[in-house]
Amino acid sequence: MFDVTLLILLGLAALGFISHNTTVAVSILVLIIVRVTPLSTFFPWIEQQGLSIGIIILTIGVMAPIASGTLPPSTLIHSFLNWKSLVAIAVGVIVSWLGGRGVTLMGSQPQLVAGLLVGTVLGVALFRGVPVGPLIAAGLVSLIVGKQ
């Protein structure tokens, strides 16, 4: 039997590789492996917990330089004294807020996820963009279409 979903996933993975977006490509390949093996029984859990676990791992990666000492406390303190660092802090707050809106939107309108992924891959492939992630893109979409 022909599996259209598998074909779509393979197409998105190919776009990920073509656009040098290995994060998207590898993620989709992992999901393909889950789909075609007995691991598919874990999909409900992945759908419920995957985003939260991903955000935890991302936060660990962002906080690692502080925890390891690579980013010393003096640098953190000085970030409140330099205007460029203050702008960076403000932008970080805005982007985090957008990401929060994106999580809400993706949860309430999951049909938008494919469009966000395709748009991200096309932006990387056609405009030499950087795959900053579907959460921020979803946050921007939420400003246009609303959160619900």
From Swiss-Prot:
- The answer on whether this UniProt entry bears the keyword Transmembrane helix reads yes
Can you say where in the cell this protein is located?
Cell membrane
Primary location recorded for the protein, binned into one broad class = membrane
Q: Could you tell me the keywords of this UniProt record?
A: Cell membrane, Membrane, Transmembrane, Transmembrane helix
Give the source's domain of life in one word: Bacteria
InterPro entries assigned:
UPF0756_TM
Membrane topology of the entry? Multi-pass membrane protein
Q: Does the keyword Transmembrane helix apply?
A: yes
Q: Mark the transmembrane ranges.
A: 14-34, 51-71, 86-106, 121-141
Report the GO terms under cellular component.
plasma membrane
Pfam families cross-referenced by the UniProt entry: DUF441 (PF04284)
> What PANTHER family does the entry give?
UPF0756 MEMBRANE PROTEIN YEAL (PTHR38452:SF1)
Family indicated by similarity: Belongs to the UPF0756 family.
Q: What is this protein called?
A: UPF0756 membrane protein YeaL
Q: What is the lineage of its organism?
A: Bacteria, Pseudomonadati, Pseudomonadota, Gammaproteobacteria, Enterobacterales
